[in-house]
Design a protein with these regions (language model features):
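Conserved aromatic anchor
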Residues: 382-395
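Beta-strand-rich modules
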Residues: 425-446
């Protein structure tokens, strides 16, 4: 059929526009929706049976109280940490750098005598961006009813052998794969006494100016049943802080508040990425982002990282059974109390580990989040213009802009914009949406979104 003059004119304009665009700006879109074979394989390799064996081995040390026996090979926290280190060295066949990170706590809150606090730290070095780190932890210490009781049976199967076992399983599986960024797998000590082990490591990281791009802790991820008998083995809670509770707010946080971006903190951005990735690779499993730092009256090893200014999250089961936390093992009024391994659902724990592993792999394969993202606020308009600094990755494909309604917790729309450093989203007002900018590599791996700060030209 012959073309009309209008059709011919439109086609010619499109052709001329494409030719006029520099090669770097022309959009050759990577497939961002396709599941990555490497991540799928990692998720499939996570074993509930191995997690169960790790939980039971940790329970076998009788107690892992921070001030418990350290010389025995079979009882106490010393035997537990030596076994964790040896197992990580064995399963990784030299691919992990496994070290003890230790210091002596002279005494203080919940520490009655000078005590060596020892974290087990296994690092999988990145191949192209080793200075960007993602950290995942569980705490291997345990407690009885009395937090100072260092001798009674304190199995700590769910709190937190479950998290420690999940981290060990992730480390052993992921050590057989290579990533752009580095991943640190940690079994930390003295959580029950006051987050001592994690605090020590996080402070060291800040003093060394380490680029910790994200941190997860897994604490109490072993049970799918509440004390009231409710069963939920299809979801996990992911606690993500918004505005930090500090006396002096940094300028970046003030800008978040000023622009209504309380839910666009670095931790909330990380949580969105974890939810999207985890649910993609573990079908039928839901990651529920909880807009809080942690539960009431509780705390976890992500908090020291938050206090050092890092993005950090906490995974915890949806329905806790408090009969099986911080309890001496006993039967009372016909009810079995105590944190015993028979109350751990390791199939559920394995799914939480799979969500962790998928998210970690996705993050460590992806480019870094774009830096210095700014939104033009110099005039009244119904379009939204943004600009950002260039990423340096050799395999960078370009950038993606995402947006959501101000009432939504997750991204709802997106557009690939190519390898450019500025873009205008037509017809979407910055007054009505929250925006983010992500970096995308040629394999379709996507970074965490960066929130645009207002800029007046």
């Amino acid at each position: 059929m012959p073309q009309s003059p209008l059709t011919h004119s439109v086609l010619l304009s499109i052709t001329l526009l494409a030719c006029a665009l520099p090669a770097s700006a022309q959009i050759d879109e990577p497939n961002i929706n396709e599941k990555k074979t490497q991540i799928t394989k990692i998720v499939q390799q996570i074993s509930a049976q191995r997690i169960d064996s790790y939980v039971r081995k940790l329970v076998s040390f009788h107690t892992r109280h921070t001030m418990s026996e350290t010389q025995s090979d079979t009882v106490g926290i010393g035997a537990a940490r030596r076994w964790i280190k040896a197992e990580l060295e064995r399963c990784s066949a030299g691919q992990l750098d496994v070290q003890f990170d230790s210091y002596v706590e002279a005494g203080g809150r919940r520490i009655s005598k000078p005590t060596e606090i020892v974290n087990v730290v296994a690092t999988l070095k990145g191949k192209t961006d080793p200075g960007r780190y993602y950290v995942v932890s569980g705490h291997y210490d345990s407690r009885a009813t009395d937090v100072m009781d260092a001798t009674s049976f304190a199995p700590g199967a769910n709190d937190d052998a479950s998290g420690t076992a999940a981290v060990m399983e992730m480390a052993c599986v992921m050590a057989q794969h290579r990533f752009d960024a580095s991943i640190v797998f940690m079994a930390v000590a003295a959580e029950e006494q006051g987050l001592y082990g994690a605090t020590h490591w996080a402070k060291q990281a800040r003093e060394k100016n380490l680029n910790i791009a994200g941190m997860f802790t897994n604490d109490i991820i072993g049970s799918s049943r509440s004390e009231h008998g409710e069963i939920d083995n299809k979801s996990v809670r992911l606690f993500a802080e918004g505005i930090p509770a500090v006396k002096e707010l940094p300028d970046a946080t003030r800008n978040l508040i000023a622009t209504g971006g309380e839910s666009d903190s670095i931790s909330r951005q990380l949580a969105r990425h974890v939810k999207e990735t985890g649910e993609r690779y573990v079908p039928g499993f839901t990651v529920n982002i909880i807009h809080r730092r942690d539960r009431y009256l509780r705390g976890g090893d992500h908090i020291p990282f938050l206090e050092q200014g890092y993005a950090a999250l906490r995974f915890t089961e949806p329905n806790e059974d408090f009969h099986h936390q911080h309890q001496n093992v006993r039967i009372e009024n016909g009810v079995q109390l105590g944190d015993l391994p028979e109350f751990v659902d390791t199939d559920y724990t394995a799914n939480v580990a799979r969500v962790n592993a998928a998210a970690l792999a996705s993050l460590a394969l992806a480019p870094a989040a774009p830096a210095q993202v700014q939104m033009n606020t110099s005039q009244l308009e119904n379009d939204t213009s943004m600009r950002w600094n260039a990423n340096t990755e050799a395999d960078l494909a370009g950038y993606r802009i995402v947006w959501r309604d101000t009432t939504s917790s997750v991204w709802q729309g997106s557009v690939m914009v190519g390898n450019v450093l500025s873009y205008t989203v037509k017809g979407k007002s910055k007054d009505n949406y929250f925006f983010g900018v992500q970096a995308v590599d040629k394999d379709g791996n996507i970074s965490v979104a960066s929130y645009p700060m207002p800029e007046k030209k």
